[in-house]
């Protein structure tokens, strides 16, 4: 397909032919020098700004650090206040404070003693089943099992199913019965149990501030049909003793059951007494 194309030709002017050999080239050399020394035309796209922008990114204006405020020391007397505070104690106050301190010393000594752990001072009632069953039929309530882990006392209680409405509580003391608490027990649905008995459970947290010399004891009460039945371990209550007291009790039992050991102690005491008397009287010649 033929296409018409227009081509624009730019032809520089040449010197006329009649001047080719007659005129000199001085004018043309001057014209060329002027064209070389002229500055080129400025392009439409300004690349200078983009180049500077990429090389020199904007930066925050630097500020000189502000000078820190100087610390000043001001005394109270410069503001009209007193430099000292005077407190006068009367002799009565001193005596009272001394007596209070002396009164608190025994409690402080007890508090500074290391905390002693406690253990159960009774056997598990259910281990002797015949005796346990006998006490249950007699008192209508009996402690079945009990464990002590740290400061948590847990256990189960068996009661006779006399009536539908019943209440089982554990009465416990932490200060030798000066005060006591009644803990309500929870009914356990024992599927494999007997129909004539019910099972209850309890959980008691023992305070960590209980003094070693204070006894921790508890007993069980069972209320049904307007009557209250008690299980107090045959009048001795269920006690929790410290390990130190337990060692003392075992030592006493060992001395009673071991007469040979007691005889050795007597012989040692007699020998010590004889040597002491010989030293006082002097040597015998």
From Swiss-Prot:
InterPro entries, A to Z: CBM21_dom, CBM21_dom_sf, Pase-1_reg-su_3B/C/D_met, PP1_regulatory_subunit_3
GTP-binding as UniProt keyword: no
Induction of synthesis: Expression is up-regulated by hypoxia-inducible factor (HIF) under hypoxic conditions.
Residue interval(s) of motif PP1-binding motif: 72-75
Function summary: Acts as a glycogen-targeting subunit for PP1 and regulates its activity. Activates glycogen synthase, reduces glycogen phosphorylase activity and limits glycogen breakdown.
Keywords: Carbohydrate metabolism, Glycogen metabolism
Subunit structure: Interacts with PPP1CC catalytic subunit of PP1 and associates with glycogen. Forms complexes with glycogen phosphorylase, glycogen synthase and phosphorylase kinase which is necessary for its regulation of PP1 activity.
Tissue expression notes: Ubiquitously expressed in the examined tissues including brain, muscle, liver and spleen under normoxic condition. Its expression is higher in insulin sensitive tissues (liver and muscle) than in the brain and spleen. Significantly increased expression in the liver and muscle under short-term (1-12 hours) hypoxia exposure. Significantly increased expression after long-term (natural) hypoxia exposure in liver and spleen. No significant differences in expression in brain for any time periods.
Provenance organism: Clarias batrachus
Domain notes: The N-terminal region is required for binding to PP1, the central region is required for binding to glycogen and the C-terminal region is required for binding to glycogen phosphorylase, glycogen synthase and phosphorylase kinase.
Domain of life from the UniProt record: Eukaryota
MF terms (GO), sorted A to Z: glycogen binding; protein phosphatase 1 binding; protein phosphatase binding
GO biological process, one term: regulation of glycogen biosynthetic process
GO cellular component: protein phosphatase type 1 complex
Pfam family, one: CBM_21
Family annotation (Gene3D superfamilies): Carbohydrate binding type-21 domain
Limits of the CBM21 domain: 133-241
Name of protein: Protein phosphatase 1 regulatory subunit 3C
